[in-house]
Design a protein with these regions (language model features):
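A short, flexible loop at the N-terminus of ABC-type nucleotide-binding domains that lies
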Residues: 1-36
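ABC nucleotide-binding domain "signature motif"
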Residues: 61-72
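The feature captures the beta-strand-to-loop junction immediately N-terminal to the Walker
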Residues: 41-43
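ABC-family P-loop ATPase nucleotide-binding domains
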Residues: 71-141, 145
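Conserved Walker
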Residues: 46-50
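Conserved small/polar residues in nucleotide/adenosyl-binding loops
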Residues: 156-158
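A short, proline-enriched helix->beta-strand linker immediately N-terminal to the Walker B motif
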Residues: 147-152
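Helix-to-loop junction immediately C-terminal to a conserved catalytic motif
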Residues: 56
Length: 158
């Protein structure tokens, strides 16, 4: 990855769902430099979720979407994570397992210092049982899980 390439580059992006005649995104331009933080704010239906899924390569389109100079659909770069809302409904994360065991099962032991900092910051208790916590607590566990590894690009939609 060249340090001079933007982290994200999208020009004149148009997207519409097959089931709709209206555009979800129309003429969208976005350039994010490495290390930048961007918060997408908009009304329901404005295209925030669609844009994040496109950037993550989770939804296909014919646009030229570059992440670290690579096309997300044809040669997706490594080092990208997408934390989406679907995760909270997954039966695996609603099982009878402690947060400690769950985080270890996804590699938390490899990043223990970073994991512990996130647990403290997000006020997550390792003894919580995943099937007994609220949706808000489950999303905090998801953030901890998703941010434990040092990703090059984190796309967070929760």
């Amino acid at each position: 990855m060249s340090a001079s390439l933007p982290a994200v580059e999208v020009h004149n992006l148009h997207y519409h769902f097959a089931s709709s005649t209206s555009s979800a995104l129309e003429g969208c331009d976005l350039v994010l430099e490495r290390g930048a933080r961007c918060l997408l704010i908009g009304a329901n239906g404005a295209g925030k979720s669609t844009l994040l899924r496109l950037l993550a390569g989770k939804r296909l389109c014919e646009a030229n979407i570059l992440v670290f100079g690579q096309d997300v659909f044809h040669s997706p770069p490594c080092g990208i994570t997408f934390l989406g809302t679907e995760w909270a409904m997954n039966p695996v994360v609603r099982g009878d397992i402690t947060v400690s065991d769950f985080l270890d099962s996804v590699g938390g032991f490899r990043f223990s210092e970073r994991r512990d900092m996130l647990l403290d910051l997000l006020d997550v208790d390792l003894s919580w049982k995943m099937h007994m916590i609220s949706d808000g607590e489950r999303r905090r566990v998801q953030l901890c899980m998703g941010l434990m590894a040092p990703w090059d690009l984190s796309l967070i939609h929760i």
